[in-house]
Amino acid sequence: TDLIGIRVFFLYREDWIHFHQYITNRFENKPELYIKNRLEDFDEDITHYYIAEKPKVYKRAGDTKIYDKNEIEIIADGIYRSLHYIIKYKGYYVEIQGRTLFEEGWSEIDHDIVYPYNTDDEMLKDFSTLLNRLSGMADEMSSYFRRMKGERERF
């Protein structure tokens, strides 16, 4: 039902909060505006810009706990990682996704090789799961390097 999709990438997973604040500072975010049915609840007003669904994060078990449950709906997915926002903008629903470069890399490879045609191929699913774990570790390591750099600069 969304006609426009935007992906935003960041280097470090903990930078999600800056992305989240950017979205919530520019678009009205009130639970009473959240839609239940995108077609039945459609708002014809093209001047009213708002967040149309509670923001969501899809995260994997073992991910660091950096998300605030009050600000964003946390969905524990076995593998997929991404932030999702549905915005009502100029009469259209716009989906905005945010993820790290490593998450995007895994997602594109998985989508190209496994989904939607080879979802029953156990070997491909195993390789996709392994690549997902490696991308998660790469995210953790990049964040660790960033913290190390900050510590070194303090001294």
Task: Enumerate the predicted regions with their spans.
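Intrinsically disordered, low-complexity acidic/polar and Pro/Ser/Thr-rich regulatory regions
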Residues: M148-F155
